[in-house]
From Swiss-Prot:
GO cellular component, one term: phosphopyruvate hydratase complex
Name assigned to this protein: Enolase
Subunit note: Homodimer.
Cited HAMAP family: Enolase (MF_00318)
Catalytic-site annotation from UniProt: 211, 347
Top-level division of the source organism's lineage: Eukaryota
Source species of the chain: Yarrowia lipolytica (strain CLIB 122 / E 150) (Yeast)
Compartments where found: Cytoplasm
Binding site for substrate: 159, 168, 297, 322, 374-377, 398
Cofactor binding, per record: Mg(2+) is required for catalysis and for stabilizing the dimer.
Signal peptide start-end: none
NCBIfam families per record: eno
PANTHER family, per the entry: ENOLASE (PTHR11902:SF1)
Length: 438
């Protein structure tokens, strides 16, 4: 069924910045998508088109991207009478219309909004849920797999104030029978953590960062990890809930010195304490020995390939590429060849279409990698990634703490999907890393 109407507008994300919303109308109704945006963005990501007009929204407006949908994409798509059920052909048309490698002509935020809306319309036309439509597009095996929620309960780095360099400390409730039990345990730990943070660091420590995690004035990773393990113990889930880290280390990498500064938010940081890639790897290895860490994302800067490969060869946990791979097939291929990671962080707005996201996931699965579907720090009420995680059989999702509506929207959607699927789905649990093969 072709598109009858396509219209974009700007709305606001969870950080109060403008983002693109797209409405796509067919005979079956109106289908809507909202595009997220990131705070720590990889230099190799598809281009998020911002207006750069300092007089409006501090230069972060998206009026140009909206205009590109309404004046360029919409008439072309309607004219071409594209079938919304054929996602690959639809997305190919969008890519050819843009014609650049990084989607800089029309903007990845314009293209993605249309791509997601088309996927929703395709599902609507088939009369199936979005996750089922995606599973069909991706040729995912049955049964469906509900993902382990990687809950970002403590924020540092670019997502919070304080001096903590590492960006995210997550809990992963793996040792449970269902997604709903897993999420319940995670929320109980989160509430214990808030109580402990307030007790230890004062009332303001209960305030939350961009992704809903607490952001106490913590200096070191050990301090953060001790607080989290104490919360897990207090909630009664020792051994059942694991820990994951997203270092987002490109944020504290000093290119000139080729070293990592774990005190990068301090203007008087002691340069003698800056670490080489190997020294940082040794530090991480000590943390992995001491705490129940099962996954480590972006341990090194996005182009420090040697440090990544060295770390993967010396550890047996999941090493996730985000800034390293930016959901980009070329960089994923290189990372697979150089054994620089063993899991992909899948962010649809890093690559810009549903089809390319599916391809990135399938390329990763073919290499026996894990795939973790992810939100961005600037999120909205759009729940597409919940359906994507189930449709791709990813087995793991990170979409913030169990706090703030834009984060909970995704977890709540997963609860609905779990209820709807019943015994047609299983929970990934401790097999989250290779859930495609469960």
């Amino acid at each position: 069924m072709p598109v009858e109407k396509l219209h974009a507008r700007y709305v606001y994300d969870s950080r109060g910045n403008p983002t693109v919303e797209v409405d796509l109308t067919t005979q079956h109704g109106l289908f809507r998508a909202i595009v997220p945006s990131g705070a720590s963005t990889g230099v190799h990501e598809a281009l998020e088109l911002r207006d750069k007009d300092a007089s409006k929204w501090g230069g972060k407006g998206v009026l140009k991207a909206v205009q590109n949908v309404n004046e360029i994409i919409a008439p072309a798509v309607i004219d071409a009478k594209l079938d919304v059920k054929d996602q690959a052909a639809f997305d190919k048309f969008l890519l050819e219309l843009d014609g650049t490698e990084n989607k800089s002509k029309l903007g990845a935020n314009a293209i993605l909004g249309v791509s997601i809306a088309a996927a929703r319309a395709g599902a609507g036309e088939k009369g199936v849920p979005l996750y089922e439509h995606i599973a069909s597009l991706a040729s995912s095996p049955q049964p469906y797999v509900l993902p382990v929620p990687f809950l970002n309960v403590l924020n540092g780095g670019s997502h919070a104030g304080g001096r903590l360099a590492i960006q995210e400390f997550m809990i992963a409730p793996t040792e449970f029978e269902s997604f709903s039990e897993s999420l319940r345990a995670g929320t109980e730990v989160y509430h214990e953590l808030k109580k402990l943070a307030k007790k230890e660091y004062g009332a303001s420590a209960g305030n939350v960062g961009d992704e809903g995690g607490v952001a106490p004035d913590i200096q070191t990773a050990e301090e953060a990890l001790n607080l989290i393990t104490e919360a897990i113990d207090a909630a009664g889930y020792t051994g059942k809930i694991k820990i994951a880290i997203d270092a987002a280390s490109s944020e504290f990498y000093n290119e000139e010195a080729n070293k990592y500064d774990l005190d990068f938010k301090n203007p008087d940081s002691d340069k003698s304490l800056w670490k080489t890639g190997e020294e940082l790897a040794a530090y991480y290895s000590e943390l992995i020995k001491k705490y129940p860490i099962v996954s480590f994302e972006d341990p090194f800067a996005e182009d420090d390939w040697a440090a990544w490969s060295h770390f993967v060869s010396t550890t047996d946990i999941q090493i996730v590429g985000d800034d390293l791979t930016v959901t980009n097939p070329v960089r994923i291929k290189r990372a697979i060849e150089e054994k620089s990671a063993n899991a992909l962080l899948l962010k649809v707005n890093q690559i810009g279409t549903i089809t390319e996201s599916i391809q990135a996931a399938n390329d990763s699965y073919d290499a026996k990698w894990g795939v973790m579907v992810s939100h961005r720090s600037g999120e909205t009420e759009d729940v597409t990634i919940a359906d994507l995680a189930v449709g791709l059989r990813a087995g793991q999702i990170k979409t913030g703490a169990p706090s703030r509506s834009e984060r909970l929207a995704k977890y709540n959607q997963l609860l609905r999907i779990e209820e709807e699927l019943g015994d047609k789905a299983i929970f990934a649990g401790p097999k989250f890393h290779l859930s495609r093969a469960i």
